[in-house]
Amino acid sequence: MSLGCRERAQAVQGEAELKDMVRRMMPVVAQATGLQFKREPLVLRRSRAQVRDYVIHKFDEDLPPGDLAGLQSALRLFGLIPDSLELRPTMIDLLTEQIAGYYDPDSNALFIPADIDQFQLRMVVSHELVHALQDQYVRLDSIITQRHANDRRAAAQAILEGQATVAQISVLMPEQKPETLPLGLFWRQRAAMAAQQAQMKEFAHAPLWIREGLVFPYLGGADFIIWFRRTYLGRSVLDSMPRSTEQILHPERYRDHDEPTDLSVASGEPDTVRWEDNLGEFETRLLFQQLLGNEPEAATLATGWDGDRYQVLGAQSDVLVWYSVWDDAAAATRFTAGLQRAWAKRRSDSRTAQRSEIKLLTIQGRSVVRLVDAPNDWKGWRALPTVRLSGGAE
């Protein structure tokens, strides 16, 4: 048999074994999630080059050039990534390095890299099978591609990845009952996970916002799922998913139906809106952690978040206007003082032509904080954008 034929035969045999593994694992995954498969997903091998091509395709599909430029400007203005960092190549290299398998909703297929080792294979297949099952009950594409809804999307990703993380424990370690695990266990494993990830070059050199954003859905999401399974026996979390990372971080807010307040920003002086979105409680934590370097303090300062909205404005994308609303005056006052300290550090070595203003306001009877960071000669200083609140604890 020629070398090419032999390699092809081995590939066919490998895919047959993979399909057999999927069929044997499907009932166990169904039992672990409480959901039944409506159809069997496809499963295919892919080379590492094909994995990279997929990452590029999905990244460009999710963030077309205009959106990418807007988001990158926002992250630079907040100080969450360095001005020198180019988001697209950084994320593509990092995701290519990280991905050990993926489920593609468009083709209803699990794709497994050809170079994956046998130790990882069962773990990856069990995890991605959960995503295939989730896609049969909710539209994954519509959830993970919500535009200008960063925090809600992050909360949804935490549910999807958290459920898959918990379910794979039941698949790989049947003797371990997830409901018996201590609450908060997964998030406390971050240090150990970070040590493992530090061996991966792209992850180790990525900014805090990227590193923590990749880890949060798995660990923070898994902790929420453990809580949910204890609190709502027999119910599916997919039927009523959290709407904010606040509800992931503080599950009692989910239980109490504490929904985030929606903010609508209206322009003052005519200007070009380059990007608009929100941070949410989790990324507000990351902002403080990045600027102040103290994780416990960052968590305290972000607690009490009830909603936020920011805009990137100006022809040069050099204006940031950020409104946030808080549960009460105490939380807003604490946040304001923390943001003033953090922003002073942020701008300590900045251009003198940039002006920053942080104010605690009362709008519609609620405690609201406004940050404006813009060039001194920005025309919008004469009539700043305003905000309207709706929903939440109005």
Question: Language model features by range: what are they?
Answer:
Residues R6-R8:
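Bacterial signal peptide processing site
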Residues A198-S317, Y323:
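Pan-zinc metallopeptidase signature
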